[in-house]
């Protein structure tokens, strides 16, 4: 885990080091709110575990979240940034059948405590191919490092599956200034492949509070997963999001 943090912050340092006078603006984007589970289906191992739901068969309580993004804008159309987006959801309950999970068997009816963690570290680049007074549209690519963990604990038994890996994504953004200081923002990363899929998309209303601060409120969806011999996991996570973008 320490190596993962070191790697991410080294890359972030490279981005910061690139911020010379050629950069016209630095943005700090902070976001918080409430996160709650849609579906969250798991089978570990993918070819022999018990398929169960962390949200339908167990109870997943809503929780708070936060995300931090730093963005450098230069040459009008080019943007480079870094994102830290931690996510953690805890579930409790019982199953009416034995649970085979990551090499351990939990008897039916046992009170279960499950933890779902999916932290995300990203570096991205975007080029705005359309920039008008009312509308901006851009696209690029994202390099994502996922730090995932699913764990189950009950009656002195505990088992977990940890997965840390690299995921390439397509980055996109649409900003529509539809009325005075109000704008609609659609911003996200997404990609689908035979190995799995991932989507992280925000639809939000922006209000230009001043030249230095934009306020935002909206709905974010994080969805995706993978299906292979080691793991089957597909989740839909919903966010009620509030935040601010500070322009320096």
Where in this protein do the model-derived segments appear?
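Short glycine/proline- and aromatic-enriched beta-strand/turn motifs that initiate or cap beta-hairpins
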Residues: 22-87, 247
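Repeated loop/turn-to-beta-strand initiation elements of outer-membrane beta-barrel proteins
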Residues: 77-80, 133-135, 180-184, 212-215
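Solvent-exposed loop/turn segments connecting transmembrane beta-strands
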Residues: 133, 166, 189-200, 229
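Hydrophobic, lipid-facing positions within transmembrane beta-strands of outer-membrane proteins
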Residues: 28, 54, 64-68, 119-123, ...
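Transmembrane beta-strand segments that form the barrel wall of outer-membrane beta-barrel proteins
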Residues: 181-196, 221-222
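Predominantly the C-terminal beta-signal and adjacent terminal strand-loop region
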Residues: 197-247
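Extracellular/periplasm-exposed beta-strand and loop segments of Gram-negative cell-envelope proteins
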Residues: 38-63, 86-118, 146-165, 173-175, ...
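Residues on the lipid-exposed face of transmembrane beta-strands in outer-membrane beta-barrel proteins
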Residues: 30-32, 68-72, 82, 123-127, ...
């Amino acid at each position: 885990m320490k190596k993962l943090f070191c790697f991410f912050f080294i890359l972030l340092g490279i981005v910061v080091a690139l911020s010379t006078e050629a950069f016209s603006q630095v943005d700090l984007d902070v976001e918080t709110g409430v996160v709650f589970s849609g579906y969250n289906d798991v089978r570990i191992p993918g070819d022999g575990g018990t398929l169960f739901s962390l949200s339908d068969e167990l109870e997943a309580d809503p929780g708070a979240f936060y995300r931090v993004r730093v963005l450098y804008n230069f040459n009008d159309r080019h943007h480079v940034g870094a994102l830290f987006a931690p996510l953690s959801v805890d579930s409790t309950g019982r199953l009416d059948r034995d649970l085979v999970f990551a090499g351990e068997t939990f008897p039916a009816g046992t009170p279960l405590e499950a933890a779902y963690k999916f932290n995300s570290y990203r570096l991205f680049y975007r080029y705005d191919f359309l920039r008008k007074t009312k509308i901006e549209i851009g696209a690029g690519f994202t390099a994502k490092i996922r730090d995932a963990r699913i764990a189950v604990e009950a009656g002195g038994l505990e088992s977990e599956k940890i997965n840390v890996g690299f995921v390439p994504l397509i980055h996109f953004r649409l900003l529509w200034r539809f009325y005075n200081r109000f704008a609609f923002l659609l911003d996200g990363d997404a990609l689908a492949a035979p190995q799995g899929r991932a989507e992280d998309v925000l639809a939000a209303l922006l209000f230009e509070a001043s030249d230095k601060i934009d306020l935002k409120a909206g709905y974010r969806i994080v969805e995706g997963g993978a299906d292979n011999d080691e793991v089957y996991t597909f989740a839909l996570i919903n966010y009620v999001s509030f935040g601010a973008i500070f322009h320096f």
